[in-house]
Regions:
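ER/Golgi luminal nucleotide-sugar-dependent glycosyltransferases, focusing on the catalytic module
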Residues: 1-497
Length: 497
């Protein structure tokens, strides 16, 4: 058995994540040769990663998307050389896994010698064509998905396939790639009399979804022995999921991978944190944690108190709220260092007197310029003092005097305080969340949803300053999404990346 693997890779910086090398390590066990085709850049780190598996690495101009990457690899061998292989596998870095050995799939498909080409999974097509552009059909045909497709020797030797690739036009866009290659390849060659199949059979899901690997990946992995899943499952726009589901596919997939497979979850987190906006994976995975007000893990809580550096940063402006602010701080472990900023020199001794008998390791009060409210104080004066700590919490006294009736603002503060620091056990449980999850960077309370704040929730957390913020970001040349954080939060100063 001689099997060639063609692996297509694109990443804007040319960096190769560990999930890719994990995939290639298993794939390579089933190959005689591997060629990697990179569109655009390949960093030194990326080249070293691929060099574990092959010396045949092609770096080409970022043109033609995946189609021309595959064409480049095929052209580099030539049809005579390609005809020496029993199978040619074309796959790419949009897949993650495997959760079971790929050998199972290769062995099972090799038993069917009637096939000319085969793949991992199928798209069941659509009665209309959702893609704009150069349609070959007025509907979307059933097709093998291009993330994993295999050609048999007799298919490679056939002039029809050779002419198809020799005459492939330049691909100008993703839509062009779908219309000219992925969505039509299977039908075009089926119509010519060639036989095909897929490893993951989903005919029973035709009425359920046209895209089983994205919409019900857990079912495919658990019940249909699918070895691979889509990276896109975690990065897909939630709005697109909500057209067909309640958003549960990605959450179910994550839970299944974590609880029922040996797949290293670090591989997912490292890639998501490096390449995705936190807003997206937080929303897609519904990363909301409910923290109990009674200690759940005494051993971990004690370890944190003994071995971790804990800080509480506070910005205190309202002296008539000193008692409640002190009560908040009193819920933190005695090993805590407290850093307080305030807006005037006359407030400093009041705060120092109020906090003098607090059972904590230290209290430091600093007078700061009265600009930027609590945010300016935190970013400019408090945050630099927290870098040597493992865990830190930030809060400020909250009155919201601009709201009417005053109960609206008071309840804002209640929501924040109750969720951040209900009692001493609650604080320890929050810190335990960080201790158990090295990738967790920030925990913050939910939006207040009462009174006028209800509309802020409906607008994604923004109030009247949304347009001002958009203008500021445009002036600064910022293009990325904003990460909206409440001004009460816990943070871990050193996280895994």
């Amino acid at each position: 058995m001689k099997r060639l693997g063609i692996f297509f890779f694109y990443e804007k910086n040319g960096d190769v994540d560990d999930f890719i090398t994990y995939y290639l390590a298993d794939l390579n066990k089933n190959l005689t040769e591997l060629v990697v085709v990179c569109n655009g850049k390949l960093s030194e780190q990326g080249r070293a990663a691929f060099s574990q598996f092959t010396d045949n690495i092609i770096v080409r101009e970022n043109k033609g998307l995946d189609v021309w990457a595959y064409k480049t690899a095929l052209d580099s061998y030539g049809w005579a050389k390609l005809s020496e292989f029993d199978e040619i596998v074309m796959t790419n870095s949009t897949l993650m896994g495997p959760v079971r050995p790929l050998k199972e799939m290769f062995d099972a498909m090799w038993e069917n010698q009637d096939l000319d080409f085969w793949g991992l999974s199928i798209h069941h097509g659509a009665k209309s064509n959702p893609f704009k552009g150069k349609h070959l059909y007025n509907y979307l045909p059933v097709h093998i998905q291009s993330h994993f497709i295999v050609y048999r020797r007799r298919f490679v030797q056939n002039p029809a396939l050779q002419a198809y690739w020799d005459n492939m036009p330049m691909i100008e866009s993703y839509t062009d790639s779908v219309q000219r290659y992925e969505a039509v390849f299977t039908k075009q060659f089926e119509d010519k009399g060639f036989k095909w199949d897929v490893y993951v059979k989903t005919d029973d899901l035709k009425d359920f979804t046209d895209y089983p690997l994205l919409v019900c990946p857990t079912l495919l992995l658990r019940e249909k022995k699918c070895p691979l899943f889509k990276r896109r499952s975690f990065m897909h726009e939630l709005e697109a999921y909500l057209n067909d589901t309640a958003g549960e596919p990605v959450q179910e997939l994550y839970d299944y991978l974590r609880d029922e497979t040996g797949y290293p979850m670090d591989l997912i987190w490292k890639n998501m944190i490096r390449t995705m906006h936190p807003h997206d994976f937080t929303r897609n995975l519904a990363l909301t944690r409910i923290i109990e007000p009674t200690v759940l893990d005494e051993a971990t809580a004690q370890s944190i108190r003994q071995n971790r550096r804990i800080a509480l940063a506070m910005h205190l402006y309202f002296m008539d709220m000193l008692d409640s602010s002190k009560a908040f701080a009193a819920k933190f472990p005695p090993e805590t260092d407290i850093f307080i900023s305030t807006s005037s020199a006359d407030k400093k001794p009041q705060i120092e007197t109020a906090f003098a008998d607090l059972n904590v390791r230290s209290v430091t009060v600093t007078v700061v310029e009265n600009q930027g409210r609590d945010v300016g104080a935190f970013l400019c004066d408090l945050a630099p003092q927290l870098r040597d700590y493992d865990y830190a919490c930030f809060m400020h006294d909250k009155k919201a005097i601009q709201t009417r009736p005053g109960s609206v603002g008071a309840s804002f503060g209640y929501v924040c305080n109750e969720n951040v620091c209900k009692n001493a056990a609650h604080v320890l449980n929050v810190l335990c969340e960080f201790e158990k999850d090295p990738y967790l960077g920030i925990l913050c309370p939910p939006y207040p949803t009462h009174g006028l704040y209800f509309m802020n929730m409906c607008s994604g957390g923004w109030g009247p300053n949304f347009e001002n913020t958009k203008k500021l970001m445009k002036d600064l040349g910022e293009q990325e999404k904003e990460l909206i954080l409440r001004r009460y939060f816990y943070g871990q100063t050193q996280t895994e990346t």
